[in-house]
Amino acid sequence: TASQALTSAGMQRSLVLLVDRKQNRLVAQQCVGLPGDAARLTLAPEQSQVVRRLLEKPAQLRLQPANMAQFSALLPSGLKALFAGEHLLLRSLGVDGRVLMLVVADQNGAPLSDASVQTFAKTSQCIERALSLFGRRGG
């Protein structure tokens, strides 16, 4: 699963949310290292400028003390409650430019090394390739 891949990449907490275009929301699909209620999380993109931006096209955002003040108020309260701390990665994954899921991950709030961020990015690319291959097979 995507969560297992992220755990193998060193992320101690992760949340994978799928885009539900009919309901215009993100729905939690997989979670690791988070409270049980994380599995029931739904996010409304219109409530967060950061989430809206990430859903426009596949992209990555690294939150750390230097930019946390800028972005914290723009994050959904549900995510802030689950991922307390100043070190967080958010990445939207997609196929052919269309975003299908949002991944949120960290190392229990600890600072992320550049190597950890690169590993997260590479793992995310692998998940995207798998999504693309799965989609071509017709589901």
Regions found by a protein language model. Name each.
Residues 36-69, 119-122:
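Acidic/proline- and glycine-rich, intrinsically disordered low-complexity segments
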Residues 1-8, 50-53, 57, 77-78, ...:
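Amphipathic alpha-helical regulatory segments at dimerization interfaces
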Residues 31-34, 101-111:
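Short beta-strand-to-loop transition segments that serve as allosteric relay/switch motifs
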Residues 74-100:
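Helix-to-coil/beta transition segments that act as allosteric "coupling" elements at the rims
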Residues 3-6, 12-20, 26, 52:
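Short, hydrophobic-rich beta-strand element in sensory/regulatory alpha-beta domains
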Residues 106-124, 130-139:
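Regulatory loop-to-helix N-cap segments in sensory/regulatory domains
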